[in-house]
């Protein structure tokens, strides 16, 4: 927590920007829909487009915190400490992933874009929150400095939005996008909104894919560092 407070940019990213996103969504989108062009039919798509920025933002924070600690050789020091490095990293990622989950859970309540049962929404929110450690680990595996990390975050931000194009593809070709983990999250969310029931196949594939991704990323991160 001290590292977040120490770096004002990360503080803004972790706490203020998600709030700004929520306020913008609550006020601006309904105004546009009422005064410029009707947008109600696209609210679910807009919800997915905007809510994913929350785990991506917290992933940005995790990535830079880990990079700071790597530059300060803290991760090397942890090799000889009673607490294992993996335990420390899990604590780091769990803390910010929980914060991400809280914002994601509050998002439908505070924005009003969709009406959804929060208990039914919870598995989808958990899947979205798993993007937080995923993004942070990828950035630290690929990038060797913060300049490169910014480029990686920008690229990954675009990649995780690609599954939204599935809603404009009317055949099974859309499942080619299933290699991107949050594709299954979006599919599960869309099914829940349309039917009122969970699609456990989409959820199951989503959780399995995220777990595999995180396991591979942990392995690659430890191998690099």
Question: Which residues does each PLM region occupy?
Answer:
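Short alpha-helical transmembrane interface motifs in multi-pass membrane proteins
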Residues: 47, 55-60, 90-91, 116-124, ...
């Amino acid at each position: 927590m001290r590292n977040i407070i120490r770096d004002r940019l990360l503080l803004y990213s972790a706490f203020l920007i998600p709030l700004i996103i929520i306020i913008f969504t609550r006020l601006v989108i309904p105004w546009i829909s009422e005064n410029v062009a009707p947008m109600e039919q696209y609210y679910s798509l807009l919800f997915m487009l905007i809510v994913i920025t929350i785990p991506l933002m917290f992933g940005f924070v995790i990535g830079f915190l880990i990079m700071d600690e790597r530059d300060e050789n803290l991760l090397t020091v942890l090799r000889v400490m009673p607490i294992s490095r993996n335990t420390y990293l899990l604590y780091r990622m769990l803390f910010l992933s929980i914060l991400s989950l809280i914002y994601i859970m509050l998002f439908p309540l505070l924005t009003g874009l969709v009406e959804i049962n929060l208990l039914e929404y919870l598995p989808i929110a958990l899947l979205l929150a798993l993007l937080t450690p995923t993004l942070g680990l990828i950035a630290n595996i690929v990038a060797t400095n913060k300049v490169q990390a910014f480029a990686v975050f920008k690229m990954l931000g675009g990649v995780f939005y690609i599954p939204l194009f599935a809603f404009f593809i009317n055949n099974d070709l859309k499942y080619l996008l299933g290699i991107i983990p949050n594709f299954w999250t979006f599919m599960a969310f869309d099914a829940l909104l349309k039917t009122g029931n969970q699609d456990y196949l989409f959820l199951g594939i989503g959780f399995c894919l995220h777990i595999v991704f995180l396991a591979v990323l942990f392995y690659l991160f430890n191998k690099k560092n």
